Amino acid sequence: MATAAAASLQYALHGAASASAKPRSAAPGRSVRVVAARRSVRARGGAVVARAAVTASADATAESKSGGHEVLLFEALREALIEEMKEDPTVCVFGEDVGHYGGSYKVTKGLAEMFGDLRVLDTPIAENSFAGMGVGAAMKGLRPIVEGMNMGFLLLAYNQISNNCGMLHYTSGGQFKIPIVIRGPGGVGRQLGAEHSQRLESYFQSIPGLQMVACSTPYNAKGLMKAAIRSENPVVLFEHVLLYNLKEKIPDEEYICCLEEAEMVRPGEHVTILTYSRMRYHVMQAAKTLVNKGYDPEVIDIRSLKPFDLHTIGNSIKKTHRVLIVEECMRTGGIGASLRSAIIDNFWDYLDAPIMCLSSQDVPTPYAATLEDATVVQPAQIVAAVEQICQ
């Protein structure tokens, strides 16, 4: 049923598209900057190794000197959607209230007026159905973006995301590609209670075939969204509810960020701190205290939750020999547990201390603000962990 509906939608979209519209691969006039800076650091034994990291903050600073414009994070996501929908008539958006209401956090505001109700499609409150419709649309050649009004609601679409979205390319023997983006708000911090404060990274990471990324700044939110839309793989983009109103100057020119590269946030020598999403800011707050105490932490926003950028992570570990992982995900079965396992498998010989991992408590998120804060990692805990690991 989902495939049949998608076929009708595809026919309507392609019929409405301009005859002069160019396919994605044929765009000689587009100037797209793929940001991927490389620099050298000293590893154990004095050898020089190359560190590949997407340095969004450095590039954004450089761009700010020559122009650019300030946007909030949710506006950066919207810019990415508009640019990709203008360029490619197969890009479409599905979800609850994504149309004229503009989405629960206004990421899709104005898109229905610009592109019509067919390409920006309001759906019933039936996550399993519209996720399946998105998979069917992708099978028929469209590039759907499926918004969950809240990431916790996508548990109702877990069957479609797991058995169809993630596995169809494999189970069809490569006959189908599933270029779909699944995105939406999640995370802890707005006193929304247990159901609305879900962190589904731990649920989705075990699904074969899915890529997962988490944005943390307006710059990388736009760059990752554009890259996810262009990917031939199904991509889950995690957005944190407390980061939507972050403001940053981003370039006027078009750019994308690599889906599989981490970002070097702060170079350092004493310990590698790996984090992502909202916890990036807790880590940077802790880093100020640590510097005053004489420590020099290296902070990496891993961004790619699946697969991990083990090149960037490994080069940092070879320099600092100590690792602290900070996440908002649950401790049991979380991203931190998988990352710790990958580090042990690949870089055990470079470690001078046990890997430490700070995660959220394995409890449902409370409503009360004080209790909510107690369930997630705070900057003081990060400072204490670094002091312990560097003894």
UniProtKB/Swiss-Prot annotation:
Main location: plastid
Entry binding sites for thiamine diphosphate: 127
Biological process annotations from GO: pyruvate decarboxylation to acetyl-CoA
Keywords: Chloroplast, Metal-binding, Oxidoreductase, Plastid, Potassium, Pyruvate, Thiamine pyrophosphate, Transit peptide
Keyword Chloroplast: yes
GO terms of molecular function: metal ion binding; pyruvate dehydrogenase (acetyl-transferring) activity
EC number, as in UniProt: 1.2.4.1
Annotated Gene Ontology cellular component terms: chloroplast
Name of the top EC class for this enzyme: oxidoreductase
Location of this chain's protein in the cell: Plastid, Chloroplast
Binding, K(+): 180, 228-229, 233
Catalytic reaction(s) noted: N(6)-[(R)-lipoyl]-L-lysyl-[protein] + pyruvate + H(+) = N(6)-[(R)-S(8)-acetyldihydrolipoyl]-L-lysyl-[protein] + CO2
Cross-referenced SUPFAM superfamilies: Thiamin diphosphate-binding fold (THDP-binding), TK C-terminal domain-like
Transit peptide start and end: 1-35
Obligatory cofactor(s): thiamine diphosphate
Record function comment: The pyruvate dehydrogenase complex catalyzes the overall conversion of pyruvate to acetyl-CoA and CO(2). It contains multiple copies of three enzymatic components: pyruvate dehydrogenase (E1), dihydrolipoamide acetyltransferase (E2) and lipoamide dehydrogenase (E3).
PANTHER family listed in its UniProt record: PYRUVATE DEHYDROGENASE E1 COMPONENT BETA SUBUNIT, PYRUVATE DEHYDROGENASE E1 COMPONENT SUBUNIT BETA
Assembly information from the UniProt record: Tetramer of 2 alpha and 2 beta subunits.
Name by which UniProt lists this protein: Pyruvate dehydrogenase E1 component subunit beta-3, chloroplastic
Organism: Oryza sativa subsp. japonica (Rice)
